[in-house]
Amino acid sequence: MAKKNKARLLVKLLSTAGTGFFYVRSRPKAAPKLAFIKYDPKIHKRVLFEESKMK
């Protein structure tokens, strides 16, 4: 039996402040790349988090 193709991806949202802090979210495969302004606890500020590759 063939494996079912997943419609959603797990993506890593990495802080643009360079602290290395990240969130993991899921998004549809057809959607554009994610970017959020969220809280970075290492610098105690809200910063932009952009999608990067998961290892």
Curated annotation (Swiss-Prot):
Major place of residence: mitochondrion
Keywords: Mitochondrion, Ribonucleoprotein, Ribosomal protein
One Pfam family matching this protein: Ribosomal_L33
Locations listed in the record: Mitochondrion
Annotated GO CC locations: large ribosomal subunit; mitochondrial large ribosomal subunit; mitochondrion
Subunit organization: Component of the mitochondrial large ribosomal subunit (mt-LSU). Mature yeast 74S mitochondrial ribosomes consist of a small (37S) and a large (54S) subunit. The 37S small subunit contains a 15S ribosomal RNA (15S mt-rRNA) and at least 32 different proteins. The 54S large subunit contains a 21S rRNA (21S mt-rRNA) and at least 45 different proteins. bL33m stabilizes the tRNA acceptor stem in the E-site.
Its biological purpose: Component of the mitochondrial ribosome (mitoribosome), a dedicated translation machinery responsible for the synthesis of mitochondrial genome-encoded proteins, including at least some of the essential transmembrane subunits of the mitochondrial respiratory chain. The mitoribosomes are attached to the mitochondrial inner membrane and translation products are cotranslationally integrated into the membrane.
Similarity comment: Belongs to the bacterial ribosomal protein bL33 family.
Record's protein name: Large ribosomal subunit protein bL33m
Organism in which the protein naturally occurs: Schizosaccharomyces pombe (strain 972 / ATCC 24843)
